């Protein structure tokens, strides 16, 4: 039993040391999105327009590929947006598939900034608001994309 506790503690400490616990990076984004631009890009060309919640030109990246019609547990989806007339990201929205989570296993977070020199700040918006909209894409595992 003591060995099990020691192993669990070591794994927890390793998780925190590696940043997997979601610590904010220097730009204000959580560490779990580090290197998202090297992940698989879901859309072939940038997505223009969209809802007021996610206006601008967007790109969507996934950390893991779909298995059949669903993304596996541990998948992270990152959507970035650049506002019209600007050349810097103003929005980074995330979806993380977590075992046992509601809404198909997805958790949502959104980060914004109003200038290229600012750090991103997390929006305090209820996750249920994201889920209500993403429910429209339930047949695509809650992920909106246009290829």
Task: Go through each PLM region and give its residues.
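N-terminal post-signal-peptidase region of extra-cytosolic proteins
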Residues: 56-67, 78-79
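Sequence context surrounding c-type heme c attachment/ligation sites in exported
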Residues: 22-39, 43-50, 68-147
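Interfacial loop at the N-terminal end of multi-pass membrane proteins
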Residues: 47-59
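Positively charged n-region of N-terminal signal peptides that target proteins for export
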Residues: 1-4
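Bacterial N-terminal signal peptides
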Residues: 6-15
